[in-house]
């Protein structure tokens, strides 16, 4: 698997609310690139390309961070580590990039997507999810963007645990194999009576 996407950024000068606010007014988002060697490089990223790559890559998919300095461009494989948003606008205020070594494993929280309508729900049960993320470890380019769990065959009192996941090759879960992700429970008598009263 190859790295398919690149985000071009520039090194930035100035720290604190004043300089960061001026950057955001220019639709540039302040951020920090944490290199695999433990160095911190302050960068500024254009808002629209950043938003697009975040929507495509999330926190799980590696892309190249191309840093421009003094007319020279250098690309580093990274994951998006942490993102800060405006309190009421859907706009970035700060972003952290985590540099990875493609030959070394990383551990990432990967979204779990539940699909289908279970047999148990059709019989009156309730689908109860316990986790929306699962912690996985693999080399960066092997990390899945999400894990899809089909609940169609789940009957009442059935549970899908971490050990039931069909993970890609060379990817392992960091949770206990018996850790429950989703179950179908029967409605309690009180719930059934409440629904009957509403009818």
Swiss-Prot record:
One of the GO biological process terms: translation
Gene Ontology CC, one term: cytosolic large ribosomal subunit
Entry coiled-coil feature ranges: none
GO MF annotations in UniProt: 5S rRNA binding; structural constituent of ribosome
Assigned keywords, A-Z: Ribonucleoprotein, Ribosomal protein, RNA-binding, rRNA-binding
Pfam families, alphabetized: Ribosomal_L25p, Ribosomal_TL5_C
Region Disordered, residue ranges: 1-21
Database matches in InterPro entries: Rbsml_bL25/Gln-tRNA_synth_N, Ribosomal_bL25/Gln-tRNA_synth, Ribosomal_bL25_b-dom, Ribosomal_bL25_C, Ribosomal_bL25_long, Ribosomal_L25_dom, Ribosomal_uL5_bac-type
Keyword RNA-binding (UniProt): yes
Superkingdom of source: Bacteria
NCBIfam families noted in UniProt: bL25_bact_ctc, PRK05618.3-1
Family the UniProt entry places it in: Belongs to the bacterial ribosomal protein bL25 family. CTC subfamily.
Role this protein plays: This is one of the proteins that binds to the 5S RNA in the ribosome where it forms part of the central protuberance.
Quaternary structure (record): Part of the 50S ribosomal subunit; part of the 5S rRNA/L5/L18/L25 subcomplex. Contacts the 5S rRNA. Binds to the 5S rRNA independently of L5 and L18.
Protein name: Large ribosomal subunit protein bL25
